[in-house]
């Protein structure tokens, strides 16, 4: 199945912040949406997930158009979202953070119990499962948030700067987690093949190497002295 959007436009008053953006991701694929602050990345995510409506353009899940569906209906159909900002429920335990979304989705008790144990184990949350969200480190919080997003078995998940507020050691752990999601046949918008947004429009798309080799990308975003280094995420994805 494919999640894709065509020619998305978003305006705020006279200012157009997203200008005809088209993106697609297949299940089991990791796609990056790159760009400097203010390029329109988060706004594009908001439109795809249903947080805001586009002024123009269309969004599809498989053959079904979902442009006008509210966010909760898109979530029910398999579109998950992890916000850039911390979204853990601060006064709830890690266990209850994960259980709460399954309860709202209507899963039965037996499924919730089994799925909780699977996620706690997969994300290395055993030692903090009873801890409140406010007590977690940046890496623990992010792992909890990703586990919660996966609790309802999404087909696709949009990760908006998932490494924000996370220490370097935890970043590597989360890179491995994201790479593992690909093997679970979940489509992810973050990096493998990438789109680079600049001033609301797609400047370039392709592999990381193709973006790094593009003179306009170097001039407007990466800088002339940029050197592409293979990250752990890419190594794990390609294994």
Short names for language-model regions:
Residues 34-36:
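The feature captures the beta-strand-to-loop junction immediately N-terminal to the Walker
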Residues 153:
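Conserved catalytic motifs of ABC-family nucleotide-binding domains
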Residues 49:
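Helix-to-loop junction immediately C-terminal to a conserved catalytic motif
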């Amino acid at each position: 199945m494919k999640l894709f959007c065509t020619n998305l436009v978003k305006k705020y008053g006279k200012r157009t912040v997203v200008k005809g953006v088209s993106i697609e991701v297949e299940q089991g694929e990791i796609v990056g949406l790159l760009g400097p602050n203010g390029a329109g990345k988060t706004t594009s995510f908001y439109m795809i997930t249903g947080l805001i409506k586009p002024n123009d353009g269309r969004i599809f899940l498989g053959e079904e158009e979902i442009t006008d569906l509210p966010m909760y209906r898109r979530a029910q159909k398999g579109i998950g979202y992890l916000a850039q900002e911390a979204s853990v429920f601060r006064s709830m335990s890690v266990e209850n953070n994960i259980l709460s979304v399954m309860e709202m989705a209507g899963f039965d008790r037996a499924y919730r119990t089994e799925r909780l144990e699977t996620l706690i184990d997969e994300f290395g949350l055993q030692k903090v499962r009873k801890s409140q969200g406010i007590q977690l480190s940046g890496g623990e919080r992010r792992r909890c948030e990703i586990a919660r997003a996966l609790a309802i078995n999404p087909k696709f998940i949009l990760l908006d700067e998932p490494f924000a507020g996370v220490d370097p050691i935890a970043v590597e752990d989360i890179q491995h987690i994201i790479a593992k999601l690909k093997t679970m046949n979940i489509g992810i918008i973050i990096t493998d093949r990438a789109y680079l947004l600049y001033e609301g429009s797609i400047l370039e798309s392709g592999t990381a190497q193709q973006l790094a080799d593009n003179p306009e990308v170097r001039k407007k975003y990466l800088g002339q002295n940029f050197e592409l280094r293979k990250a752990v995420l890419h190594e794990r994805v390609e294994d």
